[in-house]
């Protein structure tokens, strides 16, 4: 087995482990969510809000916000400690993978960056996420979530007051209903958002810590290759970035979007990235199977049935993919702008009107 095949296999197996670790981290928010629920209910059952003046309401909201701030601060502190631990582990993992991937007869012990360098990397390198969270540092990314959720919860109380709702109705709006397993309340939104933030933060620190190890071994590591998940859930950004290579100090890194599952794999000087018989995992129309490692996402998607293509990238893009007469490479190029943000169909049509015409998509 070629050295880089060993790195690829280890990285993909580790990506699966990382998704499980993310799920475990997400569950750690549950007791804090319960505390938020208890605190709000306890405060809203002391007196009927319909008897409050606006000034008294604002004092109540300040009190509630202070309670929420304390809870979210404690959660953020715990999360940040966990993220540092994860980062240290990921740096060690990458060093071990590099060391084990050395060909027979080659003595190589990968260097591991110091704890201070790892911490600096995860805290001072911005997230590659595009959109509203683009360019944020880890702390402001997490702080933005907690501030938004505090405003959402206090805003629900304020709105309920001005709309003449009873305390019970406000609590119900915040908690949700038992009939829908409390999935229709504001706290359910907070919980979902917490999950997204945690998964994205874990991906960020894992990638940045691994990259720090690769930079520490730049005499062996030439570049990194983006590896996306081959299934119908992969986003347009990750579909297009799949198999793209970047220098160690250039290009985006996972997470490229919220809840990103992509990873990067080291390209070393030991051998070509993939042996000719190398494979990677996929979940296509026929279920889970191994496919040739050199296949990009869109190479793989071309081999799937039309119905699967429609599900994966949407019926309009899929029709353009099949009938627009574009090469797979050109179709992939059309998906993102120069900043790796997704292009709309309107923007794509402006760039390739003839392809849309061939596919019968101009109307």
What does each of the following model-derived ranges do?
Residues 1-180, 273-363:
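N-terminal leader/targeting and assembly helices and adjacent pre-domain segments
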Residues 171, 181-282:
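Acidic, glycine-rich two-metal-ion catalytic cores of nucleic acid-processing enzymes
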């Amino acid at each position: 087995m070629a050295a880089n095949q060993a790195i690829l296999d280890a990285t993909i197996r580790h990506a699966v482990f990382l998704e499980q670790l993310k799920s475990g981290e997400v569950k750690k928010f549950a007791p804090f969510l319960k505390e938020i629920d208890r605190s709000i209910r306890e405060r809203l059952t002391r007196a009927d809000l319909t008897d409050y003046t606006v000034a008294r309401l604002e004092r109540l909201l300040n009190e509630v916000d202070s309670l929420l701030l304390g809870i979210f601060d404690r959660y953020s502190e715990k999360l940040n400690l966990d993220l540092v631990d994860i980062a240290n582990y990921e740096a060690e993992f990458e060093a071990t993978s590099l060391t084990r991937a050395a060909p027979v007869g080659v003595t190589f012990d990968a260097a591991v960056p110091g704890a201070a360098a790892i911490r600096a990397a995860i805290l001072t390198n911005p997230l590659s996420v595009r959109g509203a969270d683009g360019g944020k540092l880890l702390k402001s990314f997490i702080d933005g979530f907690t501030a938004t959720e505090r405003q959402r919860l206090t805003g629900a109380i304020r709105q309920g007051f001005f709309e003449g709702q009873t305390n019970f109705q406000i609590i119900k709006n915040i908690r949700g209903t038992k009939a829908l397993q409390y999935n229709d309340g504001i706290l359910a939104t907070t919980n979902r958002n917490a999950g997204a933030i945690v998964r994205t933060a874990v991906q960020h620190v894992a990638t940045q810590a691994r990259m720090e190890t690769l930079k520490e071994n730049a005499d062996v590591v030439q570049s990194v290759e983006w590896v996306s998940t081959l299934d119908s859930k992969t986003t347009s950004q990750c579909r297009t970035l799949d198999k793209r290579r970047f220098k160690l100090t250039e290009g985006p890194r996972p997470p490229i979007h919220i809840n990103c599952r992509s990873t990067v794999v080291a390209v070393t000087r030991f051998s070509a990235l993939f042996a000719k018989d190398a494979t990677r995992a996929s979940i296509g129309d026929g279920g889970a199977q191994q496919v040739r490692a050199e296949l990009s996402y869109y190479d793989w998607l071309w081999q799937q049935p039309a119905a699967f293509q429609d599900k994966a990238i949407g019926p309009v893009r899929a029709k353009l993919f099949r009938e627009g007469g574009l090469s797979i490479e050109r179709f992939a190029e059309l998906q993102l702008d120069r900043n790796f943000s997704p292009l709309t169909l309107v923007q794509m049509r402006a760039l390739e009107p003839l392809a849309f015409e061939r596919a019968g998509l101009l109307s």
